Structures are given as structure tokens and as C-alpha cells.
Amino acid sequence: MQTIALVDDDRNILTSVSIALEAEGYKVETYTDGASALEGLLARPPQLAIFDIKMPRMDGMELLRRLRQKSDLPVIFLTSKDEEIDELFGLKMGADDFITKPFSQRLLVERVKAILRRAANREAAAGGTGPAKNADTPSRSLERGQLVMDQERHTCTWKNESVTLTVTEFLILHALAQRPGVVKSRDALMDAAYDEQVYVDDRTIDSHIKRLRKKFKMVDNDFDMIETLYGVGYRFRETA
């Protein structure tokens, strides 16, 4: 049984979301503040976590920041309509998705299923136990110049330096690096990283690209392999 961690100080949300997820066969562990959640997430890692942003003792952003130091666990944020900046900041920090309150339980469940499904597809493709989703589904290993991506171990290195990526970041980068010099539209990158049932807008892909660039510049300040073609999309530079 897959476990979902739910972190929110609103007990009504904890109750309603837990009921919806448990009805789909998931085990739900709940927390009412970020500090206790961090301890529990590291001690008993779930398959996915859902965070509220505004919480006592440690807010969702700080919780994500600390979690990302040790884990690439998929994370969905619950946000309010007036928290657009927080949404963008969360994506830049490595959140996989966000849902704006008020939301339907069905929408949340579908987002959870989609993220867990793409993670399972990635593992199946790595182990050769299932069909690839499409032509851009990562293979076991990819080498492009100084870039090495190992799908089975979910590792990425640049110039022999490790770069920690979330599931979404890994899939986006792989889609770009798989065909250097070929422009990938935002729609194509959405298809590579998200289930077709999940709606994401352009700013989500843009935020993930910015996050990727930032992570690579942390190990190589001269990193410039991801190019932007304004109005068209992105591409990974061809190596000599």
C-alpha cells in the first residue's frame, strides 16, 4: 500500500483529504505542523507528500527546503489564490505540483495518481518491466558530453559532480538532452514530465527550467547547456 503524507494545520482539510485518499486505497499519515512533519518524513518516507504553505512551527517552504537537502520525494503544495509568488518560489525550490484552494477532492486525487504513476513508469522503464510512455521516456543511462544521467539509480552528474534532481526535473532534462540541438516546446516538455490528465501551465515548465539551471550552476558557474528560444521552447546544446 502506498503512503501519502499530508501536512496541514487545518483539521477539516486533513479529514476530508484523508477520506478521499483512503477511499482510493492509499495509507495517509497526517501532520499539523512542519517541524513534526519533517521528522516523520525522514524517519518514515512516504511515496508522496502534500504540504500546506502557511503552518505553525515551520511553514511549507522551509519544510520543502530542508527536505530537499536529503530527499527528492515528490511534493504537491496546497496554496491560496493570493499566494502566486509562493507557488513560483515552491516550484523553484523543487515542488512537483501545486493545487489552489479551494479545490475538488477528485482533482487532488488525480494529481496524486498522475505523479505516482509517472514515478512508477520511470522505475519500470529503468528495470525493463514495462513499456515506455513515449519516445522521450528515459532509458537506463544517457551520456551527453559532461552530462551523465542514470535512470535506474535516478542520478545525474555534470563534470563528475552530482546534481540532485526531483522526478519532474529529471524527466524534463532527459527530454531535452535526449536530442541535443532539437527544440522542445513547452507542450512537449509537459508531455514528457506530466501525465496527460494533469493540467500545468507555461510558468510551471519555466520554473522547472530555472531551477535546473540554478542547480547546475551550483556545480559549474559556466553551465549554459539549456537554451531558451523565446516563443518556441527550449533545447539542450549540441556537444562537439
Curated annotation (Swiss-Prot):
Biological process per Gene Ontology, one example term: positive regulation of DNA-templated transcription
Residues in Response regulatory domain copies: 3-116
Q: Which InterPro entries match?
A: CheY-like_superfamily, OmpR/PhoB-type_DNA-bd, Sig_transdc_resp-reg_C-effctor, Sig_transdc_resp-reg_receiver, WalR-like, WH-like_DNA-bd_sf
GO cellular component terms, semicolon-separated? cytosol; protein-DNA complex
Give the cofactor binding note. Answer: Binds 1 Mg(2+) ion per subunit.
Q: Taking the first listed entry, what is the main subcellular location of this protein, grouped into a coarse class?
A: cytoplasm
Q: Which SMART domains match?
A: REC, Trans_reg_C
Q: Annotated Gene Ontology MF terms?
A: DNA-binding transcription activator activity; metal ion binding; phosphorelay response regulator activity; transcription cis-regulatory region binding
* Free-text description of this protein's post-translational modifications in UniProt: Phosphorylated by ChvG.
Q: Which cofactor does it need?
A: Mg(2+)
Q: Which pathway does it take part in?
A: Glycan metabolism; exopolysaccharide biosynthesis
Alphabetized, the UniProt keywords read:
Cytoplasm, DNA-binding, Exopolysaccharide synthesis, Magnesium, Metal-binding, Phosphoprotein, Transcription, Transcription regulation, Two-component regulatory system
Where, in this chain's numbering, is Mg(2+) bound?
8-9, 52
Give the intrachain disulfide bonds: none
Residue range(s) of DNA binding per entry: 139-238
Compartments (UniProt record)? Cytoplasm
Q: Which residues carry this modification: 4-aspartylphosphate?
A: 52
Signal sequence span is none
According to its UniProt entry, the function of this protein is described as:
Member of a two-component regulatory system ChvG(ExoS)/ChvI involved in regulating the production of succinoglycan.
Name of the protein this chain belongs to: Transcriptional regulatory protein ChvI
Organism placement in taxonomy: Bacteria, Pseudomonadati, Pseudomonadota, Alphaproteobacteria, Hyphomicrobiales
**Gene expressing this chain:** chvI
